[in-house]
């Protein structure tokens, strides 16, 4: 198996410009494809997940030109041209869920599939919501999971659409982005969410981006959403993808563990991404954090003992960035508890199980529950631990931080970071010193 040996390091400092946000990139690509007019997208992320979205849009007849991190998309005025397509979408939830919804109302014959792990990630709640408006979607293998077959259907909305919110916020995102394309007599469609909506900031991203393309969603708490119906997205002309706040978390943590100053550029106070909340969690752990509109800087730890403070915190709002806290907990002066992270279990891997296994390899005592993780750091990190990454980009990036504990660490299958941040390790190594 291919591997990468890192460290030992004791310092981290410098400045890093973040790649574009994965969540924003794939949303903007689909919105631009559905819009009327031409959209120039800048700072578009170049990664496995954005490539599968672009490949899918190309197969669906969408015209675009890409040059570096700029992509010019010619919109289809709400009707994707291809009446038939077989779409391989890898393990990209940000492509599978929204495209399933968009194609369900497009009137064609489509197949959606991906890597084996994608066929283990649930999509049944989204399919149930789409079937409420007449969509014809069949499961090819296991009920509730891809691969999917989508067929032409008579779509009509005559009652509020109900969708569960406690498994993945991407189900709601997919419905919100698609429903403006469906005409109703009342001129609007209502979506009602059952259960506690997880990852609320990702829904806020969706709503903000839809507004940039001319569609305003009304939100009543997090339980009810009203979407205008039978209207077209309008291109904003130009739109810039802000830096990836989830990716920022690794560098911000490095600035705390390695003394800093370490600055990330591309996200800050003005960000529409919830994962900038990672900076607040890091401050609660005692890190020295300052923030501008589009930058965040960390300068080590501000307490007397020089270690991070342990925390007990609900991470429902920032589940991806919470993974970085789990590894930062190795450097805390006591036991850290991460709560309300049940969504980890249906991500690229079962992240609760994976995190517990790999933290144990470096000496931590870990208690893993259905939706929580309790991490007690060791007196001394175990050197030369070989970290398995489970084809999960975030596992690989998180555990690079172990090298800042003055011990070498081996990352197995390091190229899995290509899903969102292909040159992550080059950037990390440019900021770290023995």
From Swiss-Prot:
It is found in: Cytoplasm. HAMAP family: EPSP_synth (MF_00210). Monomer. InterPro entries: Enolpyruvate_Tfrase_dom, Enolpyruvate_Tfrase_sf, EPSP_synthase, EPSP_synthase_CS, RNA3'P_cycl/enolpyr_Trfase_a/b. The gene is aroA. Phosphoenolpyruvate binds at residues 22, 93, 121, 170, 351, 394, 419. The keyword Amino-acid biosynthesis applies. It is an enzyme of class 2 (transferase). Keywords: Amino-acid biosynthesis, Aromatic amino acid biosynthesis, Cytoplasm, Transferase. Its EC number is 2.5.1.19. NCBIfam families: aroA. Belongs to the EPSP synthase family. 3-phosphoshikimate binds at residues 22-23, 27, 168-170, 199, 320, 347. GO terms for molecular function: 3-phosphoshikimate 1-carboxyvinyltransferase activity. The active site is at residue 320. It holds the Pfam family EPSP_synthase. This is 3-phosphoshikimate 1-carboxyvinyltransferase. It catalyses: 3-phosphoshikimate + phosphoenolpyruvate = 5-O-(1-carboxyvinyl)-3-phosphoshikimate + phosphate. Its main location: cytoplasm.
